[in-house]
């Protein structure tokens, strides 16, 4: 297994269809872990079996934690791989739901300079949230585990999720993007004054 043993959140998971169906013990590392501060390494062969295993580990961890995205450094693996999916229940704007997307060696290009500040949280900062400015529209591209290429132009929450996950590959956590740290705090405390959370 590619999941490393650290003292953070243990997740016991099985990912039928992406793996051999066996149980993997995996965890999501938290802010302060060195894997989250490093620039991740490019993947040389996206079709290699170890990348398929990594993706399976990531998918299981993301779904077990009920997240919408995960980057390989969040399970302490220094590879430029991100996954995300936004089901209809999590869509916050007129954009459609996003099916499971796997991007290896992703590249982002903003479309214009327009930015929007919105609420973000992260599986590596459990219980926390903050207001983060992000580009409103962008192009992204990346390679799939089958060796294909994904190219999309997206906006809204989809664009926010991609930017958040790709930041992890460069050692950036969302508080580092915030302009006003007074909007950063524990979700349960913020809910008392911001009911829309």
Feature roles, as predicted:
Residues 6-197:
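Positively charged
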